[in-house]
């Protein structure tokens, strides 16, 4: 596929739910962390914005969750002060990065992420996250509805359910997003726009 050249200054890489307590559910996450760290370096090096999204609850958030919500059973391990909710050190935020804390699945839900992106003139989003069927799927849909150009960094996403990641990246996401690899990201940000499918 051929994509339009991407202006790094109007692009943000969203690193979503790269938290210790979530990464632990995947087993071996080294390749995923390496891909995300490389993507962060590429985007940052080209003048793009990095954004971090993490799921974590404070006491008031726990009280506000309705009993029918899937989040009603979340325990203290997901409290905002728990080490399990911290962004992994291998991909840790730096000063000037966007950071938001959410209490639902999608990156835009319960956050001011959209406003922070718009304030910085961001029009293109590159998504990396865990899980593909959770935060990534929800954010692809929401970001497309908000008229962002959306790219999914396939090797920067993972899902604990076998086959789900492949199905979403091959069959569902291409309806609203371009699916790329970490190797293709550098070329896109340099302006060539050519991605072999």
Spell out what each predicted region is.
Residues 12-18:
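Acidic-leg catalytic submotif of subtilisin-like serine proteases
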Residues 26-43:
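…and closely analogous acidic/polar surface helices at protein-protein or active-site interfaces
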Residues 19-24:
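Short acidic, Gly/Ser-rich segments with clustered Asp/Glu that frequently serve as metal-coordination loops
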Residues 43-62:
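Von Willebrand factor
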Residues 63-69:
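Short, flexible, mixed-charge acidic loops at enzyme active sites
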Residues 1-12, 38-46, 71-197:
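Active-site-adjacent betaalpha module
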């Amino acid at each position: 596929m051929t994509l339009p050249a991407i202006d790094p200054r109007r692009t943000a890489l969203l690193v979503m739910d790269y938290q210790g307590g979530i990464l632990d559910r995947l087993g071996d996450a080294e390749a995923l962390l390496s891909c995300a760290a490389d993507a962060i370096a590429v985007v940052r090096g080209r003048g793009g914005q990095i954004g971090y999204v993490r799921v974590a609850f404070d006491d008031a958030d726990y009280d506000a969750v309705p009993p029918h919500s899937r989040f009603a059973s979340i325990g203290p391990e997901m409290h905002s002060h728990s080490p399990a909710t911290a962004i992994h050190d291998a991909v840790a935020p730096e000063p000037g990065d966007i950071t938001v804390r959410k209490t639902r699945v999608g990156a835009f839900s319960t956050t001011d992420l959209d406003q922070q992106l718009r304030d910085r003139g961001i029009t293109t989003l590159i998504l990396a996250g865990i899980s593909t069927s959770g935060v990534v799927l929800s954010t692809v849909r929401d970001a497309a509805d908000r008229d962002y150009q959306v790219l999914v960094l396939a090797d920067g996403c993972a899902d604990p359910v076998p086959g789900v990641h492949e199905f979403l990246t091959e069959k569902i996401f291409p309806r609203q997003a371009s699916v790329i690899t970490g190797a293709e990201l550098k070329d896109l940000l340099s302006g060539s726009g050519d991605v072999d499918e």
